[in-house]
A protein has these predicted regions:
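Hydrophobic anchor at the beta1->P-loop junction of P-loop NTPases
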Residues: 5
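P-loop (Walker A) phosphate-binding loop of NTP-binding proteins
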Residues: 8
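ATP-binding Walker
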Residues: 11
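Walker A/P-loop
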Residues: 14
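NTP-dependent small-molecule kinase module
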Residues: 23, 137-167
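ATP-dependent small-molecule kinase phosphotransfer cores
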Residues: 33-80, 84-91, 116
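A glycine- and Lys/Arg-enriched "phosphate-lid" helix/loop adjacent to the NTP-binding pocket
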Residues: 93-138
């Protein structure tokens, strides 16, 4: 089984994905980390050097390289489902799970990792909250195309595992 975790940055896709993969005895791929390994530079550097449009094209290329891998849990970038036909492709090749979180719950998580997230670099307080509300509203239509939607509040890998196996 291939499972694609989608959702806003900071929703727990990577943290839960690693644990879920372990529980399922699957491999784990963090798409952003995979891109960084393949490109030899950070996401932040790619954004700074080449811009978001270039990054989204790279993201699509690398997603398609791994999309038909079996027995893997893939943590996607927050914007991955929103570009090209990425969401449709993930839906075709595996189980997609949207980890849904309210913007106010995302803020503390994002503030802890802001330096690694180029889209929110330098944002704080109301500016960050407004940005999260706005972009989450824009992305939710894509996220809700997932096969399953689960709330990320107090979500454990065990609960996510059980949820993925439910019909």
């Amino acid at each position: 089984m291939t499972i694609f975790l989608v959702g806003y940055m900071g929703s727990g896709k990577s943290t839960l994905g690693k644990k879920l993969a372990y529980n399922l005895k699957h491999d784990f791929i963090d798409l952003d980390s995979y891109i960084q390994e393949q490109e030899g530079r950070t996401i932040k550097e790619i954004f700074e050097d080449d811009g978001e449009d270039y990054f989204r094209k790279l993201e699509r290329v690398y997603l398609h390289r791994i999309i038909d891998t079996e027995n893997v849990v893939v943590s996607t970038g927050g914007g991955t489902p929103c570009h090209f036909d990425n969401m449709e492709q993930m839906n075709e090749y595996g189980l997609t799970v949207y980890i849904n979180m309210h913007p106010k719950a995302l803020i503390p998580r994002l503030q802890l990792s802001e330096e690694f997230r180029p889209l929110i670099a330098g944002m704080e307080g109301e500016v960050l909250l407004d940005y999260v509300y706005k972009t989450l509203r824009e992305r939710e239509g894509f996220y809700h195309k997932a096969h399953k939607v689960v709330t990320g509040y107090n979500l454990s890998a065990k609960k996510l595992h059980e949820f993925c196996l439910e019909d």
